[in-house]
């Protein structure tokens, strides 16, 4: 047996304090503050029949032996506000209640049936909520056993009833003539089952005459604070019969208790008549064969009675709140003896009680009774109400226990099933095997909460709450706090989505003590940070249920190892996810990165070789600081594997970042100025621990990066998805494909593949990049001719190394070489004389390519088909940007296919042709009347070049579509034949050698070049050199 305080929260959790040291044989000590009385009038039971509330419900098991509510009077010296811990004003919140119940736990060694026979319906010592059960037959006791049972009530169960006192002639559960107890050591301690002895002078006050006790009002103090009530005598007798069997012979008849009629005034000690109502109590025959036999250690009777008797006066003086609204209560004279205890609250489960002992045999219950209103009679018919606040979502019913009992049973059973202690004691065995400094009582406090809406709710006057003592205040610092955090972290990870997690058991607020001490740690599942919220579902899955992080700082090494292994093996992750997990700024990500880099062995490698190996395993993506963190982890691992290669880890990190920048400068697009070795050496001066890096090392690294650029992996899954979309004949969604992270201006960027598009032409081509976007100069090392096999599929010209195969998927490099031909124009390169059968292809972003065909016919076929496809599917352009400046800007050309029909497309192209011709005339007329200089003249030249090119392009589109419509066929072979037959004059088709952007008369020029106007027409582009 042990003593402590437990608080029940509204979510169903509880917290129990370490046991208090009982004051042995010190009746003169201070009386502790009495608990509030709102729980005394309620009932509760620990039942095993149903599952506990909540999403993780399971069958509840037996936890404790029968226990008895411990009740006591309020201390006349201490009377703080009952709501002091939670309300600064001392007033209770509206509709809120706070209940404290003190229980006594006894572990039974063995159970014997009543009088050698099992009790009918099983013995279930419970009072459930909801009504009054019919009285059960109780065996009568002879006169010889009355004295012993009364002494047992004083020693074994010192629980005085709520206002009831023992009087001669009381009719109720105890039968037989009254006998005056013998106050002696032999007479008292001979009845104790464990043979405990103690001073007898403190027990003399237990048996006083009935005239010393009167019926008092609320707030009064007992006139005789040391009397043994009839309720305590019945409890003692029931316990004696429960543990040791009945003293009556088995043949003794049992008759149900009867309600004692009110005694007329003047009977006994001359006081007024009262109401004596018998109550029935059923006791549980539980299966405790596995419990070893133990002696029962008892506490000092004087101490217990002194602490509890004053509370009974306040409880007895309260008006009863258990009666039904509207129930007629006959008035009774105020001065009168309490002839009987409060009638028992029925369980409301008559069907279960009459069904036999199949369910009741496993029930272990506790009960809390309420003192009856003085001088009032409560009928046995009709359900009674209890001030016990119901937990949310639960209500008492005839098919299951009340919410208080169900939640309490679930808490104790769950902690016992986990093999942990729900108190600061070592295990549950300590409850039944107390030490010499432990008390046999537990205090459980229910938090104030608004009750469920009920008609005419009773309003009992609350008593002062129980002040937490030293054992209660140190509950959060007990040895079970850390274990409880781990269990709560596990429970929080397994919590069903959409459900609120239960409140922590070890919260200081559950005791009403305010803020937690500085030394205690908050529960893990209540701390959420930005870094923890960044974890996606895959990372949480890798962490497991017990690897919850707190503010990104409490990392679990085992979880980091599991996640790093899965990232390296790409088990449930993509390559694009690896850098995102390694680049976070928290301790867990650092652990994951350290474990991930352990899979790489860079021993004996140079820095550039190790960097190439590392970048092939992940796609280095994300923001600059995220990528820098990933490179920092790589540098740390490289220095661990090669401690002698560089002077420090910081030096390795500096060189790694320098190589990344050098790779961009040497191989990136649109870089006006490249770095050389001298500039690299100048940039790295003094960054090697205050010194310079060896020149030979920098020279080797520079040569390696210049000869072979760094390649890192792209998202293969996204690449496969894009290829599958190209091969899917019936797509539902068209997604924009992004190019690899290594080329900033790849032709494959911003392409919208057309799944299921028709293949219009394929054949061998030789390509040369003549100008980058906006007609910028292409670097000299990227201008060479390369052989490809061209595939015109939809609005995209794919260039692949191998010959075209219809069922073969395209590779990454082939996708990067693709060119979109929306708003493009192909013309014969008559000005280029180095190679035969060459034609130009200018794209919408003003890139220029040179293509060489195997023959003249193939060149004409490629030019015609590219222009026809562009004319068929190019959508009308968007308006140009509007600005307060007069700077010229080209309109936006959409890459999506048009939704117009071919007739409407022809009319659109013709309208744009007329508009461009009219605008060109106006622009030239403006130039003749106004001589511009400087930037204005440059802008006028750019606009004129643009208008000339657009007029030629729309004229070509309109002419080709008119020929196609006149041919009346969708086959491009027929269109080619019609174009060749027209000769380019009848329908206004421009000659194949003409080019609106590249001058046709270039005999004096050795090679093709952009004109000055075209070079200036590129937005911000530089001028081409002749």
Curated annotation (Swiss-Prot):
Organism phylogeny: Eukaryota, Metazoa, Chordata, Craniata, Vertebrata
Biased composition (Low complexity): 168-184
SMART domains hit by this protein: PH (SM00233), Sec7 (SM00222)
Residue ranges that the Swiss-Prot or TrEMBL entry lists as coiled coil: 900-926
Biased composition (Acidic residues): 300-313, 349-367
Compositionally biased intervals (Basic and acidic residues): 934-943
Keywords: Cell membrane, Cell projection, Coiled coil, Guanine-nucleotide releasing factor, Membrane, Phosphoprotein
Entry keyword annotation includes Zinc: no
Domain PH: 758-871
Function according to Swiss-Prot or TrEMBL: Guanine nucleotide exchange factor for ARF6. Induces cytoskeletal remodeling.
Family of the protein in this entry: Belongs to the PSD family.
Domain SEC7: 514-708
Principal subcellular localization: membrane
Ranges for region Disordered: 25-97, 126-196, 246-403, 436-538, 924-943, 978-1026
Compartments, record wording: Cell membrane; Cell projection, Ruffle membrane; Cleavage furrow
Keyword match Ribosomal protein: no
Composition bias, Polar residues: 1000-1012
GO biological process: regulation of ARF protein signal transduction
GO molecular function, one term: phospholipid binding
Protein name stated in the entry: PH and SEC7 domain-containing protein 1
Compositional bias of kind Pro residues: 71-95, 328-340, 447-465
GO cellular component terms given for this protein: cleavage furrow; ruffle membrane
């Amino acid at each position: 047996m042990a003593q402590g305080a437990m608080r029940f929260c509204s979510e169903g959790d509880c917290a129990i304090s370490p046991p208090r040291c009982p004051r042995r044989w010190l009746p003169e000590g201070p009386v502790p503050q009495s608990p509030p009385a709102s729980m005394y009038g309620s009932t509760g039971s620990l039942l095993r029949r149903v599952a506990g509330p909540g999403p993780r419900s399971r069958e509840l098991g037996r936890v404790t032996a029968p226990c008895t509510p411990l009740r006591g009077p309020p201390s006349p010296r201490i009377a703080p506000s009952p709501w002091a811990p939670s309300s600064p004003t001392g007033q209770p919140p509206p509709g809120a209640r706070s209940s404290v119940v003190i229980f006594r736990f006894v572990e039974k060694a063995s159970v014997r049936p009543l009088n050698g026979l099992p009790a009918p319906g099983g013995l279930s010592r419970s009072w459930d909520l909801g009504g009054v059960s019919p009285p059960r037959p109780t065996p009568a006791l002879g006169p010889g056993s009355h004295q012993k049972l009364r002494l047992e009530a004083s020693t074994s169960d010192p629980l005085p009833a709520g206002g009831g006192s023992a009087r001669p002639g009381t009719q109720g559960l105890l039968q037989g003539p009254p006998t005056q107890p013998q106050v002696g050591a032999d007479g008292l301690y001979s009845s104790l089952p464990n043979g405990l002895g103690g001073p007898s002078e403190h027990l003399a006050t237990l048996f006083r005459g009935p005239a010393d006790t009167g019926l008092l009002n609320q707030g009064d103090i007992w006139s005789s604070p040391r009397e043994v009530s009839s309720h305590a005598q019945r409890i003692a007798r029931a316990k004696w019969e429960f543990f040791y069997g009945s003293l009556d012979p088995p043949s003794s008849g049992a008759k149900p208790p009867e309600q004692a009629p009110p005694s007329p005034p003047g009977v006994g000690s001359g006081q007024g008549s009262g109401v004596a109502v018998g109550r029935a109590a059923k006791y549980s025959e539980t299966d405790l064969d596995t419990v070893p036999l133990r002696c029962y250690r008892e506490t000092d009777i004087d101490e217990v009675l002194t602490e509890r008797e004053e509370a009974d006066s306040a409880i007895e003086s309260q008006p009863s709140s258990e009666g039904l609204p509207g129930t007629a209560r006959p008035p009774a004279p105020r001065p009168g003896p309490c002839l009987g205890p409060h009638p028992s609250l029925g369980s409301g489960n008559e069907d279960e009680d009459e069904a036999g002992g199949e369910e009741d045999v496993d029930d272990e219950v506790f009960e809390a009774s309420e003192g009856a209103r003085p001088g009032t009679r409560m009928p046995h018919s009709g359900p009674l109400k209890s001030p016990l606040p119901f937990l949310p979502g639960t209500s008492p019913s005839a098919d299951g226990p009340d919410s208080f009992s169900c939640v309490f049973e679930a808490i104790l059973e769950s902690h016992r099933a986990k093999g942990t202690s729900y108190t600061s004691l070592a295990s549950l065995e300590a409850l039944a095997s107390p030490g010499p400094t432990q008390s046999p009582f537990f205090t459980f406090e229910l938090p104030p909460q608004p009750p469920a809406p009920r008609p005419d709710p009773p309003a009992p006057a609350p008593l002062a709450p129980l002040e937490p003592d030293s054992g209660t205040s140190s509950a959060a610092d007990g040895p079970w706090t850390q274990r409880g955090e781990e269990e709560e972290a596990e429970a929080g990870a397994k919590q069903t989505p959409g459900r609120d997690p239960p409140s922590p058991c070890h919260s200081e607020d559950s005791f009403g003590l305010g803020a937690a001490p500085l030394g205690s740690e908050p529960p893990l599942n209540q701390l959420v940070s930005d870094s923890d919220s960044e974890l996606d579902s895959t990372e949480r899955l890798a962490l497991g249920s017990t690897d919850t992080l707190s503010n990104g700082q409490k990392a679990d090494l085992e979880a980091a190892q599991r996640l790093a292994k899965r990232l390296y093996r790409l088990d449930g992750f993509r390559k694009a996810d690896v850098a995102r997990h390694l680049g976070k700024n928290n301790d867990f990500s650092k652990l994951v990165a350290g474990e991930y880099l352990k899979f790489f062995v860079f021993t004996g490698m140079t820095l550039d070789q190790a960097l190439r190996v590392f970048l092939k395993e992940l796609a280095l993506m994300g923001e600059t600081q995220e990528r820098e963190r990933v490179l920092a982890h790589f540098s740390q691992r490289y220095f661990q594997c090669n401690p002698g290669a560089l002077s420090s880890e910081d030096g390795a990190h500096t060189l790694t970042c320098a190589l990344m920048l050098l790779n961009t400068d040497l191989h990136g697009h649109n870089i006006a100025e490249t770095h050389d070795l001298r500039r690299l050496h100048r940039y790295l001066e003094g960054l090697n621990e205050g010194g310079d890096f060896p020149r030979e090392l920098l020279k080797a690294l520079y040569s390696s990066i210049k000869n072979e650029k760094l390649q890192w992996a792209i998202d293969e899954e996204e690449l496969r998805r894009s290829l599958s979309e190209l091969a899917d004949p019936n797509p539902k969604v068209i997604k924009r494909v992004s190019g690899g992270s290594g080329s900033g201006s790849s032709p494959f960027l911003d392409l919208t593949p057309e799944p299921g598009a028709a293949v219009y032409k394929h054949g061998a081509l030789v390509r040369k990049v003549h100008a980058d976007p906006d007609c910028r100069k292409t670097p000299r090392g990227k201008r060479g001719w390369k052989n490809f096999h061209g595939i015109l599929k939809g609005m995209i010209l794919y260039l692949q190394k191998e010959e075209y195969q219809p069922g073969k998927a395209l590779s990454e490099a082939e996708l990067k070489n693709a060119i979109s031909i929306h708003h493009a124009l192909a013309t014969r390169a008559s000005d280029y004389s180095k190679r035969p059968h060459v034609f130009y292809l200018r794209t919408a972003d003003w890139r220029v390519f040179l293509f060489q065909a195997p023959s003249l016919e193939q060149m004409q076929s490629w030019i015609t088909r590219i222009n026809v496809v562009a004319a068929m599917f190019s959508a009308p352009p968007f308006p140009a940007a509007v600005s307060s400046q007069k700077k010229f800007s080209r309109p936006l050309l959409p890459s999506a296919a048009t939704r117009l029909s071919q007739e409407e497309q022809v009319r659109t192209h013709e309208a744009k042709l007329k508009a461009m011709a009219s605008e060109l005339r106006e622009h030239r007329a403006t130039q003749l009347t106004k001589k511009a200089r400087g930037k204005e003249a440059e802008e006028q030249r750019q606009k004129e070049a643009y208008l000339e090119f657009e007029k030629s392009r729309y004229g070509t589109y309109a002419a080709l579509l008119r020929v196609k419509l006149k041919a009346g066929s969708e086959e491009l072979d027929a269109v080619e034949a019609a174009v060749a037959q027209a000769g380019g004059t009848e329908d206004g088709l421009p000659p194949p050698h003409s080019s609106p952007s590249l001058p046709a008369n270039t005999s004096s020029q050795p090679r093709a070049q952009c004109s000055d106007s075209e070079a200036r027409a590129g937005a911000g582009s530089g001028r081409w050199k002749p």
